[in-house]
């Protein structure tokens, strides 16, 4: 039992170490809308721990956004650099934005990468931009909390499963030990009974045969045959609670026994 417990403890330690390595490896998940990410549920893993969002056409303000892992970019020289492009009006636009958290590039708002359109829009546009930032911050916080719960569940479920498995193994071992002990006790009792009945039967059979041989020999002409043997036989039969229907008679001079 101690050996099995030590094996189970070592197995749990190895599982925890493997989970720690996986969690600290540096890979994060990113939202990906490329064609090769359809099969993986519009998600990808980044070994560089970076996700990106960029405009398909940096010269067009209304250009759609594309998202993915930074590893999938063909050119790695300009990774996470603030590249500036200019549209038709000449205002600078960030063509690439990087982040380093799980699903941090999952933003469906067009104004994530779109700056304000100039000072001419006035104070209202500035307030609208601040509101958009607050909304984005709230979305990021909600996503972070969901990811935190997801990580906790990923860690807790295997540990709980391992503990339940250990408890089931310990319960099965205990049941097997008790069953084995009970079977051994039954076997010992059966062997002792067989041994006692075998030796007791042979000893009683030998005593009865000896008494029969002794009682077949007469003591004298017309005297009772083996009075001592009769007493011993009656004592043995009374001890075993067996009633005998045969009584030894008188020995006659013709050399035969009479039964009553």
Curated annotation (Swiss-Prot):
Q: Where in the cell is it found?
A: Membrane
Entry GO CC: cytoplasm; plasma membrane
Q: Which GO terms describe its biological process?
A: cell migration; negative regulation of BMP signaling pathway; negative regulation of osteoblast differentiation; negative regulation of transforming growth factor beta receptor signaling pathway; positive regulation of canonical Wnt signaling pathway; positive regulation of cell population proliferation; positive regulation of DNA-templated transcription; positive regulation of epithelial to mesenchymal transition
- Gene3D superfamilies listed in its UniProt record: CD59 (2.10.60.10)
Highest rank taxon of the organism? Eukaryota
Segments on the Extracellular side according to the record's topology features: 27-152
The text of the family note is: Belongs to the BAMBI family.
This protein's name: BMP and activin membrane-bound inhibitor homolog
The source organism is Ovis aries (Sheep)
Gene name linked to the record? BAMBI
């Amino acid at each position: 039992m101690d050996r099995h417990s030590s094996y189970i403890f070592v197995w749990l330690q190895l599982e925890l170490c493997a989970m720690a390595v996986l969690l600290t490896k540096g890979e994060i998940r990113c939202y990906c809308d490329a064609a090769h990410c359809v099969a993986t549920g519009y998600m990808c893993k980044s070994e560089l721990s970076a996700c990106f969002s960029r405009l398909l056409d940096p010269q067009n303000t209304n250009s759609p956004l594309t998202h993915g892992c930074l590893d999938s970019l063909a050119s790695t020289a300009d990774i996470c650099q603030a590249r500036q492009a200019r549209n038709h009006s000449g205002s600078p636009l960030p063509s690439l934005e990087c982040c380093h958290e799980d699903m941090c590039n999952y933003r469906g708002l067009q104004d994530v990468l779109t700056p304000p359109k100039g000072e001419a829009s006035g104070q209202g546009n500035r307030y609208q931009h601040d509101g958009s930032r607050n909304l984005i911050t709230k979305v990021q916080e909600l996503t972070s909390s969901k990811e935190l719960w997801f990580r906790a569940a990923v860690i807790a479920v295997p540990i709980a499963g391992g503990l339940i498995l250990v408890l089931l193994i310990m319960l099965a071992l205990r049941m097997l030990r008790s069953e084995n002990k009970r079977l051994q006790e039954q076997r010992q009792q059966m062997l002792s009974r067989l041994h006692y009945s075998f030796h007791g039967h042979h000893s009683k059979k030998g005593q009865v045969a000896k008494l029969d041989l002794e009682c077949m020999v007469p003591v004298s002409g017309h005297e009772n045959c083996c009075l001592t043997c009769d007493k011993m036989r009656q004592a043995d039969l009374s001890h075993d609670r067996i009633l005998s229907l045969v009584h030894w008679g008188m020995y006659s001079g013709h050399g035969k026994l009479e039964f009553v």
